[in-house]
Amino acid sequence: MKDLVNRSKRMSRRRLAPIRAGESIDYKNVGLLRRFISEQGKILSRRVNRLTAKQQRNMTKAIKRARILALLPFLNNEN
């Protein structure tokens, strides 16, 4: 009985979507891109940021483009 209660609590908890309906994945949207980069400047994995495979591919391309255009740093070595 206790397992059923615990299982139902876990199943009912829903996580919010990391990207809202109005937001688009674009290299110029630096505020959005920063949410998907670690403190060291690495791109977070799909498991961590809960994106779909297609969204993760687009996010990675946008982050790399923004880095090349110097909108985002390649590394964050601020101590």
Swiss-Prot record:
GO terms for biological process: translation. Keywords: Chloroplast, Plastid, Ribonucleoprotein, Ribosomal protein, RNA-binding, rRNA-binding. Disulfide bonds: none annotated. GO terms for cellular component: chloroplast; mitochondrial small ribosomal subunit. It comes from the Eukaryota. Pfam families: Ribosomal_S18 (PF01084). GO terms for molecular function: small ribosomal subunit rRNA binding; structural constituent of ribosome. It is found in: Plastid, Chloroplast. InterPro entries: Ribosomal_bS18, Ribosomal_bS18_CS, Ribosomal_bS18_sf. Part of the 30S ribosomal subunit. Belongs to the bacterial ribosomal protein bS18 family. This is Small ribosomal subunit protein bS18c. The gene is rps18.
